[in-house]
Every structure is written in C-alpha cells, then in structure tokens.
Amino acid sequence: MSSRRSSRSSVSEEEINELISKLQSLLPSSRRRGANQASTTKLLKETCSYIKSLHREVDDLSDRLSDLMAGMDHNSPGAEIIRSLLR
C-alpha cells in the first residue's frame, strides 16, 4: 500500500525534465546560451547563485530607498509618491 502511495506521488522523469527546462529559461545566463543544455547540477548551482544575486540587489535597493527617504521631507510630494508606490 505504501508503494502505491509513493508511486502516485512521485514525479515522472518527463515532468522533471520539463521543470528543469523551464528553470533554465528563467536564468539570464541560460537564455544567452540558447539551446545548449546544461547539466542539472550546473543549472541548480546557477539558479542558487542567481537567487543570491537577486537578494543582494533587493538589499541594495532597500538601502538606497531608506537613504532617499531619510533625506526627504516626509510631507513632500516626492515622499507621498514613494509611499504610494510601496503600497
């Protein structure tokens, strides 16, 4: 019975290949390579690296926004625009 349950919940190799292909299409470096297939291990490492770089970029943008807001009059039209964008 447990083998039935695990076989129903398992993902087919075709589904895994499709997911890997979709993941590859999301990475900027993979798009430049075109149709070349990277190994799954390399693709996952590139994905982790890309996610880390996105985190750093978000942190940097957050710091820049904080600096910008700190130097602004909180009642100014510019501050109101920024607040509305963040909602």
From Swiss-Prot:
Subcellular compartments: Cytoplasm
UniProt xrefs under PROSITE patterns: BHLH
Regions crossing the membrane: none
Keyword set, alphabetical order: Brassinosteroid signaling pathway, Cytoplasm, Growth regulation, Transcription, Transcription regulation
SUPFAM superfamilies in UniProt: HLH, helix-loop-helix DNA-binding domain (SSF47459)
Tissue specificity of this protein: Expressed in phloem of leaf blades and sheaths, lamina joints, filaments before anthesis, vasculare bundles of the ovule, lemma and palea, and embryos.
Gene3D superfamilies, A to Z: Helix-loop-helix DNA-binding domain
GO cellular component annotations of the record: cytoplasm; nucleus
Function per UniProt: Atypical and probable non DNA-binding bHLH transcription factor that acts as a positive regulator of brassinosteroid (BR) response. Controls lamina inclination by participating in two BR signaling pathways involving BRI1 and RGA1. Involved in the RLI1-dependent modulation of leaf inclination by promoting lamina joint cell elongation, especially in response to phosphate (Pi) availability.
Assembly description: Interacts with LO9-177.
Similarity remark: Belongs to the bHLH protein family.
Entry protein name: Transcription factor ILI4
Organism field: Oryza sativa subsp. japonica (Rice)
The encoding gene: ILI4
